[in-house]
UniProtKB/Swiss-Prot annotation:
It holds the Pfam family Thymidylate_kin. One of its GO terms (cellular component) is cytosol. InterPro entries: P-loop_NTPase, Thymidylate_kin-like_dom, Thymidylate_kinase. Its EC number is 2.7.4.9. The lineage of its organism: Bacteria, Pseudomonadati, Pseudomonadota, Gammaproteobacteria, Candidatus Pseudothioglobaceae. Belongs to the thymidylate kinase family. GO terms for biological process: dTDP biosynthetic process; dTTP biosynthetic process; dUDP biosynthetic process. One of its GO terms (molecular function) is dTMP kinase activity. It comes from Ruthia magnifica subsp. Calyptogena magnifica. The keyword Cytoplasm does not apply. It catalyses: dTMP + ATP = dTDP + ADP. It is an enzyme of class 2 (transferase). ATP binds at residues 11-18. Phosphorylation of dTMP to form dTDP in both de novo and salvage pathways of dTTP synthesis. This is Thymidylate kinase.
Amino acid sequence: MQRGKFITIDGVEGSGKSTQIDFICDYLVTKKINVILTREPGGTELGEKIRTLLLSTDIQSIHGDTELLLLFAARNEHIRTKIIPSLEKGDWVLSDRFTDASYAYQGGGRGLSIERITQLEKWVLQDFTPDVTLLLDVSVALGMSRVESRGRKDRIELETNDFFKRVRNSYIERSKQFPKRIKLIDASKTLEQTAQQIKIILQVL
């Protein structure tokens, strides 16, 4: 049986991931491809509990290193018990965020050591990597205006604009570092125009 493809989709808050995830799933279904939709943090019973902890506004402060370790603990469980088994069955897996988010949010946003993140990545992922990463890019101003329209914010969404500017810059640097895997998509365009950019990438997978 042919191994499935692993697609990740990432970007700052308000980049439109949820809408484009729906488009990707619908597109793959038309191609008779079985797709497993998952997310980080989350995707497993343990991961979802960690997600609740990390996003809860009831917790006033979490040390950056603690946050990073919890994310990689959830990621390890996610990879071992859901992503790899699904790929080995021939399913395609689409994950809302993956390791690039740790470099952007914890590395760029929080200012944690990139070397430390890389060490955790090598330990947890080993040689495992997505087939393609769709990086939806919007300005922080546009992204946060979309977040404001959704109503109540989680712990991460309550961060400052400067935090999200650092996150965005880190994402862009990652796309320059890994241009073959990370496809930078202008998500400030209409939903249809953004989806068309994604469709072109999916057609050559």
